[in-house]
Design a protein with these regions (language model features):
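RNA-recognition motif
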Residues: 34, 108, 251
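Compact, charge-rich alpha-helical regulatory domains located at protein termini
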Residues: 209, 214-282
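Intrinsically disordered, low-complexity Ser/Thr/Pro/Gly-rich regulatory segments
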Residues: 31, 57, 61-221, 238-241
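Residues marking the start of alpha-helices
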Residues: 10, 24, 182, 225-226, ...
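Short Gly/charged-rich anion-binding patches and loops
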Residues: 18, 92, 189, 232, ...
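Short leucine-rich amphipathic alpha-helices used at interfaces
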Residues: 3-5, 9-12, 203-205, 211-213, ...
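Long, C-terminal-biased catalytic regions of enzyme "large/alpha" subunits
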Residues: 1-82, 89
Length: 282
């Protein structure tokens, strides 16, 4: 079995079926995906990097005429390019959870008061009797692990907020659970600690079958970076509560023109989005 080197330095077996599954998720037909997997299988060699394999797959999707699937295949890279200075990842997660039935708020003001100190919360999500405090941990390098310290701090934050609420502290909230959301993955110790302390983790392919990537794909709520928008363009959109491609698709053309998008370009972008969210569309 050919060994490949993952971006975090770990060694793994080459898995042809993973290629098929990932291509299918991107929207290509199973027949095309099988051909691409065969092609890659013929090109891999001992010690090849997973990054080189991803580049091969992306290129083969393009040359096979599946340009929209090729765009979707770059989802992980697009998420990593969200800009921390304009809090894109936090806003993106805030909007994503709304599709899941939550009422969400980013960085509530005034800060949430605990028993001991006040706390800046990335996202507060409410659904029925559930009130969740969420820490959004974004990494530019998509092989960077989120370590033990993050869920430990989040559990301590929840403990203090719960204490503040029980004491009737002003600006407290009735927090019922704590989450950490990251665009990469977690260290083994972070996972073990979170299971023990009931801190919910969401990451790329974690929990298995219900990870952040599956959630994005289920709702077709792709980031604005996936359609090639520049940082200054995305900043204008974020300031107008447009956080993902679905928001942009629904945006009024007059608003888009006012913030610098000519009608013709706005329509081209919306046409691209329509194809991305509906792979079967011609």
């Amino acid at each position: 079995m050919v060994k490949i080197v993952k971006m975090n330095g770990a060694v793994d077996d080459f898995n042809k079926q993973k290629i098929v599954r990932s291509c299918v998720r991107a929207g290509a037909s199973r027949e095309v995906c099988s051909r691409i997997a065969d092609y890659v299988e013929g090109k891999v060699y001992e010690g090849i990097s997973s990054k080189d394999i991803l580049s091969m797959i992306h290129e083969q999707l393009k040359v096979s005429g599946n340009k929209d699937a090729a765009v979707r295949y770059k989802l992980k890279d697009a998420i990593s390019k969200l800009d921390p200075e304009i809090h894109e990842f936090e806003f993106f997660i805030m909007r994503l959870l709304r599709y899941d039935g939550y009422d969400t708020e980013r960085s509530p003001e005034p800060k949430v008061q605990g028993l001991c100190v006040d706390h800046e919360i990335d996202v507060v999500a409410r659904r029925r009797k559930e009130t969740v405090i969420i820490e959004c941990k974004h990494h530019y390098r998509d092989h960077t692990f989120t370590g033990l310290d993050v869920p430990m701090r989040q559990w301590a934050r929840l403990d203090d907020i719960v204490g503040g609420y029980k004491q009737g502290t002003r600006n407290s909230i009735n927090a019922t659970s704590a989450w950490v959301v990251t665009n990469t993955n977690y260290s083994e110790h972070a996972v073990r600690y979170s299971k023990c302390k009931h801190v919910q983790l969401l990451a790329w392919n974690y929990p298995y079958g219900h990870g952040l990537n599956e959630m994005i794909e289920n709702y077709r709520a792709y980031p604005l970076t996936l359609i090639g928008l520049m940082r200054n363009e995305r900043e204008k959109l974020v300031l107008n509560s447009i956080y993902n491609v679905l928001d942009l698709l629904d945006a009024d053309e007059f608003l888009l023109k006012r913030i610098g998008f000519e009608v013709s370009r706005a329509r081209r972008l919306k046409s691209l989005i329509e194809r991305l969210i509906n792979p079967s569309a011609k």
